[in-house]
């Protein structure tokens, strides 16, 4: 791939069991680019993102993400690919039994961070990036939906990913909060991180 190209899909088929979800799909994503994947509910948007972090296989065509060939990637390589990605889920998937800081600390320790000072510094850094520096000791249930989504984005930023995959990140939020989350993702993209965001909300994208 060209040096500025982060992701290239060419004529790929994405299947779940024997069902073809997407057929003959192609697109290119460059470093620092923000791309919307827009479509109706059930049109395969989430499956496309899942194929990029190797939860769903790509059956045909060519697919390259960074230095990885997604059609031929080995199982042992998948964790290393995923560490270079930040994933933002619509339903947050925060650990409800621990604080924001402990949620973020859990991810860092799971991905190999050991130094307590470096862990604390990194958590402070990402919370500032998403405007949640005063919420670190809150439990998830004490946060609004928009605040929880900001924490999810902070979690996605922890390992300084080259690409953020945001799956309907505004799907459960009111219009004003959705606009704020969208602005935050654009700010992150302007700092050099590529973003692929799925949505069924044409109005949100148009605005």
Label the predicted regions:
Residues 164-167:
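Catalytic Walker B motif of ABC-type/P-loop ATPase nucleotide-binding domains
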Residues 61-69:
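Conserved ABC transporter NBD signature motif
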Residues 158-162:
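A short, proline-enriched helix->beta-strand linker immediately N-terminal to the Walker B motif
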Residues 175-177:
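Helix N-cap at the start of a conserved alpha-helix in ABC-type nucleotide-binding domains
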């Amino acid at each position: 791939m060209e040096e500025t190209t982060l992701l290239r899909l060419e004529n790929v088929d994405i299947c779940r069991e024997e069902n073809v979800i997407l057929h003959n799909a192609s697109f290119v994503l460059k470093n620092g680019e923000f791309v919307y994947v827009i479509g109706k509910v059930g049109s395969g948007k989430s499956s496309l993102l899942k194929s990029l972090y190797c939860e769903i296989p790509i059956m045909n065509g060519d697919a390259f993400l960074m230095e990885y060939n997604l059609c031929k990637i080995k199982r042992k390589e998948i964790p290393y690919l995923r560490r270079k990605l930040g994933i933002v889920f619509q339903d947050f998937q925060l650990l409800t039994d621990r604080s924001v800081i402990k949620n973020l600390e859990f991810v860092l320790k799971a991905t190999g961070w050991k130094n307590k000072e470096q862990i604390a510094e990194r958590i402070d850094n990402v919370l500032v990036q998403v405007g949640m520096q005063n919420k670190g000791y809150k439990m998830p249930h004490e946060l609004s939906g928009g605040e929880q989504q900001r924490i999810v984005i902070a979690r996605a930023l922890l390992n300084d990913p080259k690409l953020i995959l945001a799956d309907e990140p505004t799907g459960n939020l009111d219009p004003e909060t959705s606009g704020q989350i969208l602005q935050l993702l654009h700010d992150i993209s302007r700092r050099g991180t590529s973003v692929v965001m799925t949505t069924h909300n044409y109005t949100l994208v148009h605005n």
